[in-house]
Amino acid sequence: MVVGRAIDKFKNLPEKDKHKYFSTILGNNHFVLLGAVGPDYPYLSELKNNILKLHSWADRMHYENTGGFVIEGIKNLQNLKDKEEFRVCLPWLCGYVTHLITDTVIHPVVNAIVGPYIFNSTEHRHCEMIQDSFIFKEIKKVEISYTEYTHLIKMCSEDDRGNINPAIDSFWTRTLEMSHPDGKDKFRYINPDDWHQGFLSKIELASNPIPIFRHMGEEANLAYKMTGSITDHERSTYTTDVSFPGGKKGNFINAFEMAVDKVIEVWGRLFE
């Protein structure tokens, strides 16, 4: 939801704040959405192929050399500047950065509410899914649905088999290899085509809104609550009277908008 809100606000920036790649990012915003799912993408494939417990590229993208990935991604973009692939990979990297920023801003808030993830993973998932439903209704004024987002992500497919755009395949693979040089023995598990196909199959089979941007690989039958089903306790604890780091209290939407504003700031600075 952060990425969708950021795109909407990015469109309305004053002319003086629009950098030279403004039209490239917005003109291919389906690749921004794809990048925003990027660090979560491998989970479904890793579960299916029974390699999650052995090694996880999804975990590496979340917890290992995250800044290094962005740095190497920018280097790779420099080599694509005069090529058509640049118009695809730039918005994708903007989306990827969005995911990292959102985690940096939102996770400390969730930790303050339910405790550290390592000891409270179920509570984390429940808290974040309530927050997703709440924010979607607050911003969009309708119940949570990813129909629009999933349609846009399908536009990132290269063919009917569900293969990912080849520019993204190459860029993502190369950037992972460059930012994780000690993972050479696991490079064979880098497979954006398989990750993309696994994601598409998951959302096409779902009959209810599912957490496609978070927790994709954690449980088979997760589904969001509609806001009318959120209890008073859940609403207060997770959305309207939440605990912030440092002992402060406030509305979760303030943390959400902080993440959105930071994303827009970084998009503006990333390629100056």
Can you say where each PLM-predicted feature lies in the sequence?
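N-terminal leader/auxiliary helical segments
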Residues: M1-G95, L100-E272
